[in-house]
């Protein structure tokens, strides 16, 4: 129940939600929420309020759409706004393909299931859909300093900050092979 999510200053550790990072982020999120309020292709089923009189607070908002390519399904919002699209069970594989192709972004993603087959299928088919992929966990669950983190596609270079792989972004690795006894014949020894 979103009504139980306490929102306020990050100095108060009893708050679960705090303000978004800056006014630009607030304005972007508020504009998406306002758009949904007047759009026949989507509806707000929870939340939808915002206030910047003291801080940039966006109420956790859930949007329901019948259009799997609705703008809030394809855009990185970076705020407490999530859009839901309900698919038919018979379209599971088509829906996975749709998820993989819908957005140019690929920072994080998550699937929730108790069906081991569905988990494996989704994990395999969504291989390039998220730099960090979560199974039965929230997609914002990176453990800073303990878990490599980074997105692909338009979300970044998938460098995995916090891991040795990140070093590859800043260097130009190459392999050098030197032979101290140059070949005198093109044939491998086993060919003679």
Give residue ranges: language-model regions.
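Conserved small-domain helix->loop->beta segment predominantly found in fold-type I
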Residues: 9-18, 41-52, 66-69
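Long, low-complexity segments enriched in small/aliphatic residues
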Residues: 27-43
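Structural signature of PLP-dependent enzymes
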Residues: 17, 21-28
């Amino acid at each position: 129940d979103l009504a139980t999510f306490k929102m306020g200053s990050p100095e108060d550790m009893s708050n679960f939600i705090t303000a978004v990072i800056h006014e630009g982020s607030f304005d972007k999120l508020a504009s998406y929420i306002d758009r949904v309020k007047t759009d026949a292709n989507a509806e707000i089923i929870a939340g939808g309020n915002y206030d910047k009189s003291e801080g940039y607070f966006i109420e956790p908002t859930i949007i329901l759409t019948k259009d799997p390519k609705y703008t809030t399904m394809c855009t990185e919002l970076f705020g407490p706004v999530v859009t839901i699209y309900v698919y038919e069970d018979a379209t599971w594989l088509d829906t996975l393909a749709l998820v993989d192709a819908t957005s140019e972004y690929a920072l994080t993603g998550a699937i929730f299931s108790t069906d081991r087959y569905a988990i494996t299928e989704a994990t395999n088919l969504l291989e390039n859909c998220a730099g960090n992929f979560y199974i039965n966990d929230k997609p914002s669950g990176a453990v800073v300093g303990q878990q490599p983190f980074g997105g692909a596609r338009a979300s970044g270079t998938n460098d995995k900050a916090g891991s040795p792989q990140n070093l590859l972004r800043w260097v130009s690795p190459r392999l050098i092979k030197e032979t101290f006894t140059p070949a005198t014949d093109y044939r491998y020894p086993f060919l003679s």
